[in-house]
């Protein structure tokens, strides 16, 4: 089963992935962008180089294609539980050039069965981002991230409607433990 965690930076995805690693010890944990060696290089270029938005979108699509082919598909074949920090949903939300059609091509129509969507309010997002160093995307500001968050939600529910992906929407302001229990229950109801 392919499960993804989605949310803007600061929503608590990394915290939840850490907690899930303790609970699902046999799961394959991965991330987008950067879930492969090639992906790490593409991610570094996309986030740190001064390139056009179109070029950045294609770098992320290339990363996604390689990630699906070399990580996700083999793990699905082995019937592993796969938990990914981000997916095509982020690709579509963060870039105006990353359409569903391009992402379906990059993923060979391999989609997550379950989507965990962590949503955060403006005040908590400001507070959490003030505690970390920001990359090029995060430096675009709180309002931009809140717009991206709305797009994450829109794309997650569009995948649910078009392809039957299950969505669990959570308030990221809740305690990490409370969120973890809800996420684990959502994953375990099939595992």
UniProtKB/Swiss-Prot annotation:
SUPFAM superfamilies: P-loop containing nucleoside triphosphate hydrolases (SSF52540). Keywords: ATP-binding, Kinase, Nucleotide biosynthesis, Nucleotide-binding, Transferase. It comes from the Bacteria. Gene3D superfamilies: P-loop containing nucleotide triphosphate hydrolases. GO terms for biological process: dTDP biosynthetic process; dTTP biosynthetic process; dUDP biosynthetic process. The keyword Repeat does not apply. It holds the Pfam family Thymidylate_kin. Phosphorylation of dTMP to form dTDP in both de novo and salvage pathways of dTTP synthesis. This is Thymidylate kinase. ATP binds at residues 7-14. It is an enzyme of class 2 (transferase). Belongs to the thymidylate kinase family. One of its GO terms (molecular function) is ATP binding. The lineage of its organism: Bacteria, Pseudomonadati, Campylobacterota, Epsilonproteobacteria, Campylobacterales. GO terms for cellular component: cytosol.
């Amino acid at each position: 089963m392919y499960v993804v965690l989605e949310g803007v930076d600061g929503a608590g995805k990394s915290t939840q992935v850490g907690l899930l690693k303790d609970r699902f010890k046999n799961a394959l944990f991965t991330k987008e962008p950067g879930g492969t060696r090639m992906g790490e290089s593409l991610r570094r270029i996309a986030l740190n180089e001064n390139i056009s938005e179109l070029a950045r979108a294609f770098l992320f699509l290339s990363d996604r294609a390689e990630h699906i082919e070399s990580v996700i598909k083999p793990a699905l074949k082995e019937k592993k539980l796969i938990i990914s920090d981000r997916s095509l949903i982020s690709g579509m939300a963060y870039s105006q050039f990353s359409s569903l059609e391009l992402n379906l091509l990059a993923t060979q129509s391999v989609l997550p069965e379950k989507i965990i969507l962590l949503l955060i309010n403006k005040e908590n997002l400001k507070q959490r981002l003030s505690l970390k160093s920001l990359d090029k995307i995060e430096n675009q500001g709180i309002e931009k991230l809140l717009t991206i968050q709305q797009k994450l939600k829109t794309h997650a529910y569009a995948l649910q409607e078009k392809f039957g992906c299950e969505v669990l929407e959570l308030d990221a302001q809740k305690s990490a433990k409370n969120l973890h229990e809800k996420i684990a229950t959502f994953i375990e109801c099939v595992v």
